[in-house]
A protein has these predicted regions:
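Conserved N-terminal beta1-alpha1 strand-loop-helix module at the mouth
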Residues: 1-53, 57, 62-64, 79-80
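Short, structured coil segments at secondary-structure junctions
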Residues: 31-32, 50, 78-79, 97-98, ...
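Ligand-binding grooves and catalytic loops that recognize ribose/phosphate and carbohydrate rings
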Residues: 43-55, 60-77, 123-126, 161-168
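Generic, low-specificity signal for short hydrophobic/alpha-helical stretches with a mild N-terminal bias
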Residues: 6-9, 56, 76, 98, ...
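Hydrophobic faces of well-ordered beta-strands that scaffold small-molecule active sites
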Residues: 13-18, 34-36, 54-58, 83-84, ...
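Catalytic cores of alpha/beta
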Residues: 24-29, 69-74, 116-122, 137-152, ...
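Active-site-adjacent beta->alpha loops and helix N-cap segments on the catalytic face
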Residues: 3, 40-51, 63-68, 85-99, ...
Length: 168
């Protein structure tokens, strides 16, 4: 597995989260966007044709249950570069299949925070995504305690939210 995903995030840390066809059309026109989180439908080919890295949220794919077999299906039947999931077992499977991985956490309380600190060592995702992303102080603290790069997602509603998350 190469470093294309890592390099793309490093070059432009703003990641498009595509939830509709309108989002998809707009995203594919933006040259600065290099990584796309796919949160709906069967659009990997269009994302790849636009020269972007396609990360599929395996938990949200209609018709597939979020199990290891779904990760195998994505690897064998699509051009997806990687997966996003809340399930550590799917991250492990994706790593075995040389897919990029983003482990998504809903950071609701201190127990969820402690889970991140514990699981990052056993699961070893490429990135950890924390939601909501509009928590720069918590994200900054987390970044100082773990080695896995952190992506801030959810509730990023304006430029101030983007800048707060990026500086964290």
């Amino acid at each position: 597995m190469g470093r294309e995903f890592w390099n793309a995030v490093e070059e432009n840390p703003i990641i498009a989260a595509v939830k509709s066809m309108d989002d998809l059309e707009q995203c594919c026109k933006l040259e600065d966007i290099r990584v796309v989180f796919i949160l709906f439908g069967d659009i990997v080919k269009k994302i790849k044709a636009a020269g972007k890295i396609a990360m599929v949220h395996v938990d949200l794919i209609g018709g597939l249950s979020p199990r290891e077999i779904a990760v195998e299906y994505l690897k064998n039947n699509t051009d997806a570069d990687g997966i996003i999931t809340t399930k550590p077992s799917l991250i492990k499977k994706a790593k075995e299949l040389s897919l990029y991985t983003v482990l998504r956490y809903f950071l609701l309380d201190s127990m969820a925070y402690e889970n991140i600190l514990t699981q990052q060592h056993t699961v070893r995702p490429d990135f950890i995504e924390v939601l909501p992303g509009a928590m720069p102080k918590v994200i900054q603290k987390l970044c100082s305690e773990i080695k896995v790069p952190v992506i801030a997602g959810g509730l990023i509603i304006d430029k101030e939210s983007v800048m707060g998350a990026l500086t964290a």
